[in-house]
């Protein structure tokens, strides 16, 4: 009989936590016992998992000694408090927040890109999960990086409101309904109205004029590729789409490569679905519920001898 694990999801009632629950079930992960954890406010809420009803427990009162693996998605402050305590007690923590991503002794892992880094979890019993926009970009760029190297990445993201959690989803839905019925939109989650609008700000602005979301893509790319020489120039935009992120990616490679070669490599890469010719993926039509990274509009840069353009879409 294969090994089974007792798994805890901390932040189980959030948008990401609920998706974690769905993925564990869909992938038939070998779960022996499942524990759903959240704040006292969500205690008692129930979910179905593998034909059973599982009740959400208060994290403050939970006995962690029975847990082997914990998936954290309850926010950076809570991860900062709980993850080291639980990891030191022997729980393997996989953290979905940004809190541990830049610690030198904690692996930042995309299984399709740097699976060898997983072994470093033994340093502190914590594995960090990269930002969603970084993940889809690097899955698409990994074959190019391995083949000819990458000098520079210019990327503009078009990120759905679900990246801001349930609050973002509710705000887009609420604003859209009000505006279509002739009422003014109320703005709480985003810096400006998101319905029928695009906002070139995700997270706070930093001293260099970039947002923190944009700098995450810089730092994470360099760490995951273990290559601090890669230059990354991102602009991150929140768009009025409920689910799925899209990215217009331009790379300057260290040696020239033809777009046909790039497409052939992508077509043979696990985890990528390639769209050729005039067909291209979109968040609404193609990305929902898919694990693959979708790539289209692959073409050589007409202004640079070592440039390649890609359109990259994924369910965040």
Curated annotation (Swiss-Prot):
GO molecular function: aspartate-semialdehyde dehydrogenase activity; NAD binding; NADP binding; protein dimerization activity
GO process terms (BP): diaminopimelate biosynthetic process; isoleucine biosynthetic process; lysine biosynthetic process via diaminopimelate; methionine biosynthetic process; threonine biosynthetic process
Keywords: Amino-acid biosynthesis, Diaminopimelate biosynthesis, Lysine biosynthesis, Methionine biosynthesis, NADP, Oxidoreductase, Threonine biosynthesis
Binding site for phosphate: 101, 216
SUPFAM superfamilies membership: Glyceraldehyde-3-phosphate dehydrogenase-like, C-terminal domain, NAD(P)-binding Rossmann-fold domains
Transmembrane segments: none
Entry EC no(s): 1.2.1.11
Family listed: Belongs to the aspartate-semialdehyde dehydrogenase family.
Pathway terms, separated by semicolons: Amino-acid biosynthesis; L-lysine biosynthesis via DAP pathway; (S)-tetrahydrodipicolinate from L-aspartate: step 2/4; Amino-acid biosynthesis; L-methionine biosynthesis via de novo pathway; L-homoserine from L-aspartate: step 2/3; Amino-acid biosynthesis; L-threonine biosynthesis; L-threonine from L-aspartate: step 2/5
Residues annotated as binding substrate: 159, 238
Entry-linked Pfam families: Semialdhyde_dh (PF01118), Semialdhyde_dhC (PF02774)
Top EC category: oxidoreductase
Full protein name: Aspartate-semialdehyde dehydrogenase
Domain of life: Bacteria
Family annotation (InterPro entries): Asp-semialdehyde_DH_CS (IPR000319), Asp_semialdehyde_DH_beta (IPR005986), NAD(P)-bd_dom_sf (IPR036291), Semialdehyde_DH_NAD-bd (IPR000534), Semialdhyde_DH_dimer_dom (IPR012280)
Subunit relationships: Homodimer.
Function field: Catalyzes the NADPH-dependent formation of L-aspartate-semialdehyde (L-ASA) by the reductive dephosphorylation of L-aspartyl-4-phosphate.
Annotated residues for binding of NADP(+): 13-16, 41-42, 162-163, 316
NADP in keyword set: yes
Active site location: 132, 245
Entry keyword Transcription regulation: no
Substrates-to-products reaction catalysed: L-aspartate 4-semialdehyde + phosphate + NADP(+) = 4-phospho-L-aspartate + NADPH + H(+)
């Amino acid at each position: 009989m294969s090994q089974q694990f007792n798994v805890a999801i901390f932040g189980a009632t959030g948008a990401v936590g609920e998706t974690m629950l769905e993925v564990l079930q869909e992938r038939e992960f070998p779960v022996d016992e499942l524990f759903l954890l959240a704040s006292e406010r969500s205690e008692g809420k129930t979910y179905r998992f593998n034909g059973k009803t599982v009740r959400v427990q208060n994290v403050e009162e939970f006995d962690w000694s029975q847990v082997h693996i914990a998936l954290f998605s309850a926010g950076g402050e809570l991860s900062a408090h709980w993850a080291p305590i639980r990891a030191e007690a022997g729980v393997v923590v996989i953290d979905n927040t940004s809190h541990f991503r830049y610690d030198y002794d904690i692996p930042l892992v995309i299984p399709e890109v740097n699976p060898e880094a997983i072994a470093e979890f033994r340093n502190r019993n914590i594995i960090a999960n990269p930002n969603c926009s970084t993940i889809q970009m690097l899955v698409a760029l990994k074959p190019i990086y391995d083949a000819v190297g990458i000098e520079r990445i210019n990327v503009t993201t078009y990120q759905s409101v679900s990246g801001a959690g349930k609050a973002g989803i509710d705000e887009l839905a609420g604003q859209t309904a009000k505006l279509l019925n002739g009422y003014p939109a109320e703005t709480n989650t985003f810096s400006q109205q998101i319905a029928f609008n695009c906002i070139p700000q995700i997270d706070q602005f930093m001293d260099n004029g970039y947002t923190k979301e944009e700098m995450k893509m810089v730092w994470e790319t360099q760490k995951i590729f273990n290559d601090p020489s890669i230059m990354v120039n991102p602009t991150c935009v929140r768009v009025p789409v409920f689910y799925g992120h899209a990215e217009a990616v331009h790379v300057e490679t260290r040696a020239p490569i033809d777009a046909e070669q790039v497409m052939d490599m992508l077509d043979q890469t696990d985890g990528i679905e390639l769209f050729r010719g005039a067909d291209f993926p979109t968040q609404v039509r193609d990305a929902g519920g898919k694990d693959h990274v979708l790539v289209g509009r692959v073409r050589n840069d007409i202004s640079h001898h070592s440039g390649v353009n890609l359109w990259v879409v994924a369910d965040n």
